[in-house]
Regions:
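Conserved nucleotide-cofactor-binding alpha/beta core module
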Residues: 74-193
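Core SAM-dependent methyltransferase catalytic element
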Residues: 178-216
Length: 216
C-alpha cells in the first residue's frame, strides 16, 4: 500500500465529499499518520470508510466523522481542549495539531498507554493523557473545547459545566439506530445552545452507565 496515495484518496473521497474543506483540519489529518493508530490486523484498512474495531468493544470513528468533528469545533491554536475517550489516539494526534494543549482521558489504561507511545514516536509534546473518568476531573477545570468520541444517551449538563463561556462541545447523542451529532455552544455560565450537524451511529462512550447523569 502506498501510504501517501491512500491518505490523499481518503481526504479527497471521504472528507471533502462530506463537506470537510478547512485546510488546517485536512492538514492535521494528513500529518497524524492514521496508519500508526489502527490495530495491526486492520493496517490495510487504515484509510477505509469504516469504523475500525479496537479492544474493549470500542471503535475508531470513520475518517469523515473525525473530519466533521474537527471542523465543527473551529479550533484555535491558543485553546485548551478536552478529549473524552482517547481510544486509538488518532483523533488525539489531530487535535494536538490544532490546539495549544489537548487533555485526553480514557478509563481504559491500554488506550492511554498505547497512545502515549505513539505520540512520543510522532514527537507530539502538547498532549496530557490521563486514565480516569471524565467526572473525576477537578471541578474547577474548564475548557475552551470538549470533544466526546463516543455516543451518550443524552446530553449531560455536567459536561457543559466544564466549558468556558463561548466554549464548544462536539457530542453524539441517542440510541442506535438513531443518533445525531451536536455542536453545543456555551453562551454564559448557565445558557447554551445546540446545533444538529448530522446523523450517524457510533459506539457508546465507555462507562456511560457508571454515573447517574443530570440530563436536559
Amino acid at each position: 500500500m502506498n501510504l501517501e496515495e491512500a491518505r490523499t484518496r481518503m481526504i479527497a473521497q471521504q472528507l471533502r465529499t462530506w463537506d470537510v474543506f478547512d485546510n488546517q483540519v485536512l492538514e492535521a489529518v494528513r500529518q497524524s499518520a492514521r496508519e500508526l493508530f489502527v490495530p495491526k490486523d486492520y493496517y490495510d484498512f487504515a484509510f477505509a470508510d469504516m469504523e475500525i474495531p479496537l479492544a474493549y468493544n470500542q471503535y475508531m470513528m470513520t475518517p469523515k466523522v473525525e473530519g466533521r468533528l474537527l471542523q465543527s469545533l473551529a479550533l484555535k491554536a491558543d485553546e485548551k481542549i478536552l478529549e473524552v475517550g482517547t481510544g486509538s489516539g488518532f483523533l488525539t494526534a489531530c487535535l494536538s495539531h490544532l490546539s495549544k494543549t489537548t487533555v485526553s482521558i480514557d478509563i481504559i489504561p491500554q488506550f492511554t498507554t498505547d497512545t502515549r507511545q505513539k505520540l512520543n514516536h510522532l514527537n507530539i509534546k502538547n498532549v496530557e493523557l490521563h486514565t480516569k473518568d471524565v467526572f473525576d476531573l477537578n471541578n474547577n477545570d474548564q475548557f475552551a473545547v470538549i470533544a466526546i468520541t463516543g455516543s451518550l444517551p443524552s446530553i449531560d449538563e455536567r459536561l457543559i459545566q466544564m466549558l468556558r463561556p463561548s466554549g464548544r462541545m462536539f457530542v453524539i447523542v441517542g440510541q442506535a439506530p438513531v443518533m445525531e451529532a451536536l455542536l453545543i455552544t456555551k453562551n454564559t455560565n448557565e445558557d447554551w445552545m445546540q446545533e444538529t450537524l448530522f446523523e450517524t451511529v457510533v459506539a457508546p462512550l465507555s462507562n456511560t452507565n457508571h454515573h447517574e447523569p443530570f440530563v436536559l
